[in-house]
C-alpha cells in the first residue's frame, strides 16, 4: 500500500462586500463567524483557536483577539460592511463588537439573537461559592 497524496485545498478568494458577523459568547468561550447574506461561512475564529486555554477563553480580551483575527481573514475576501448578530450571556460580547468596529468594518445593524426559553429545559443548579 503506497502513501496517499495529501490534497491541499486552496481557499479561493471570494469578493463579497457585505456580510453577517455571528458573535456567540458563552460562559466558557467566544466564537465569531462571518458569513455572506445566504449564510455561507467566509471566516471564523474563536478564543480557543487563538491559543487561550481554560478560564482565559472566557475573557473579553480573548474575544477581542478572536475578532481581530476573523476580521483580518474577512477583509482578505473584500468585506467592508457587516451586520452583527450577538448571542449568548458571555463577557466577550461588547469587546468583540468593539474590535470588529475598530478593524475598519462599517457596522450597519446590531441584533441580539439570544434564545430565551418559554420554560423549556430545567436550568443548572445555582452556584454556592
From Swiss-Prot:
Keywords: Ribonucleoprotein, Ribosomal protein, RNA-binding, rRNA-binding
Provenance organism: Rhodopseudomonas palustris (strain BisB18)
MF GO annotations: rRNA binding; structural constituent of ribosome
Role: Located on the platform of the 30S subunit, it bridges several disparate RNA helices of the 16S rRNA. Forms part of the Shine-Dalgarno cleft in the 70S ribosome.
Name used for this protein in its record: Small ribosomal subunit protein uS11
PANTHER family: 40S RIBOSOMAL PROTEIN S14/30S RIBOSOMAL PROTEIN S11
Gene3D superfamilies assigned to the protein according to its UniProt record, in alphabetical order: Ribosomal protein S11
Cellular compartments per GO CC: ribonucleoprotein complex; ribosome
Pfam name, any one: Ribosomal_S11
InterPro entries (alphabetical): Ribosomal_uS11, Ribosomal_uS11_bac-type, Ribosomal_uS11_sf
Amino acid at each position: 500500500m503506497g502513501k496517499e497524496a495529501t490534497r491541499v485545498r486552496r481557499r479561493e478568494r471570494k469578493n463579497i462586500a457585505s456580510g453577517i458577523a455571528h458573535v456567540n459568547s458563552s460562559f466558557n468561550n467566544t466564537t465569531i463567524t462571518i458569513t455572506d447574506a445566504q449564510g455561507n461561512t467566509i471566516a471564523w475564529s474563536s478564543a480557543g483557536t487563538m491559543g487561550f486555554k481554560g478560564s482565559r477563553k472566557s475573557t473579553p480580551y480573548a474575544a477581542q483577539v478572536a475578532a481581530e483575527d476573523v476580521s483580518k481573514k474577512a477583509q482578505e475576501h473584500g468585506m467592508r460592511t457587516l451586520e452583527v448578530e450577538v448571542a449568548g450571556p458571555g463577557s466577550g460580547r461588547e469587546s468583540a463588537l468593539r474590535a470588529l468596529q475598530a478593524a475598519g468594518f462599517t457596522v450597519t445593524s446590531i441584533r441580539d439573537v439570544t434564545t430565551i426559553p418559554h420554560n423549556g429545559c430545567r436550568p443548572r443548579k445555582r452556584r454556592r461559592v
